[in-house]
């Protein structure tokens, strides 16, 4: 009998304890669906838009920002892209005056905005080219800035550059030039007289490259100076009253790669 009574009392105590726990922990109603949806939307909107971020650091985006920051009325033409090292970003510094603009193009391992102060630090970005565009009072004045030469009429020792193109060599003061014409362009390679083969080799490489690539169409002429010693690569062409100059390019064939992107 005592065992039955004790079991009954233990069962009653368990029921009372369970009821007490239930009263102390009331059910918390679920949040309304609209509130949950609102919070999810807020969290989603706070995430960065990956597509916009990527678009802002593409070459097209960088070049658009370049043109926007120039704030010039000069009718200059910029390319859609430039040849840069894989895995790097294109950026630039800009400077504009009434009749002249200067753009220094850089490649960097990190994304740097146009005209970022960090571009003054050589270890943060590398100069790949400088573009200078200047407007003259007339097309005749602009044409005087182009060192155009018809090499077939200038004399010099004839040399075969391939692709049915003849070059003409001229030496003086320790320098050896190999020049030729392609359309409205006058192109010449420069080397030292103690390394004459290098000038012809570079000229042949340039001719072969231009077999499948087009330089900008000048109005009226253009000139290219390609240096074996990588110290004075210069490409200049006229577009009516405007004169485009590309320099600060170390490798001569890279200078041609930079120039062809201005073809349109």
For each of these PLM feature ranges, what is it?
Residues 3-12, 20-128, 136-149:
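N-terminal, intrinsically disordered, polar/charged segments of Gram-positive cell-envelope systems
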Residues 143-172, 204-231:
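Short Gly/Thr-rich strand-loop-strand
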Residues 165-167, 187, 244:
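Short, isolated positions in well-ordered beta-strands
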Residues 174-180, 232-238:
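Short, surface-exposed beta-strand/loop micro-motifs that present aromatic residues
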Residues 178, 188-189:
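Internal helical hairpin/lid segments
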Residues 183-185, 193:
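Mixed-charge (acidic/basic) macromolecular-recognition segments
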Residues 194-220, 240-264:
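Surface-exposed amphipathic alpha-helical segments
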């Amino acid at each position: 009998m005592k065992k039955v009574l004790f079991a009954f009392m233990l069962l009653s105590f368990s029921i009372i304890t369970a009821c007490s726990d239930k009263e102390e922990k009331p059910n918390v109603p679920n949040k309304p669906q609209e509130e949950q949806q609102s919070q999810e939307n807020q969290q989603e909107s706070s995430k960065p838009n990956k597509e916009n971020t990527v678009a802002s650091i593409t070459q097209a985006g960088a070049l658009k920002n370049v043109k926007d920051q120039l704030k010039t009325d000069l009718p200059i033409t910029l390319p859609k892209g430039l040849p840069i090292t894989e895995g790097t970003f294109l950026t630039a510094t800009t400077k504009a005056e009434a009749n002249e603009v200067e753009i220094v193009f850089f490649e960097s391992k990190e994304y740097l905005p146009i005209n970022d102060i960090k571009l003054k630090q050589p270890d943060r970005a590398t100069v790949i080219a400088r573009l200078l565009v200047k407007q003259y009072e007339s097309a005749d004045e602009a044409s005087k800035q182009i060192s155009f030469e018809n090499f077939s009429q200038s004399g010099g020792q004839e040399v075969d550059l391939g692709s049915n193109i003849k070059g003409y060599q001229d030496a003086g003061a320790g320098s050896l030039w190999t020049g030729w014409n392609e359309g409205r362009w006058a192109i010449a390679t420069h080397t030292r007289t103690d390394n004459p083969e290098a000038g012809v080799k570079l000229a042949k490489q340039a001719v072969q490259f231009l077999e499948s690539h087009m330089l900008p169409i000048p109005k009226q002429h253009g000139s290219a100076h390609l240096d074996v010693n990588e110290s004075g690569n210069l490409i200049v062409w006229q577009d009516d009253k405007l004169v485009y100059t590309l320099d600060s390019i170390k490798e001569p064939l890279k200078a041609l790669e930079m120039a062809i992107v201005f073809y349109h």
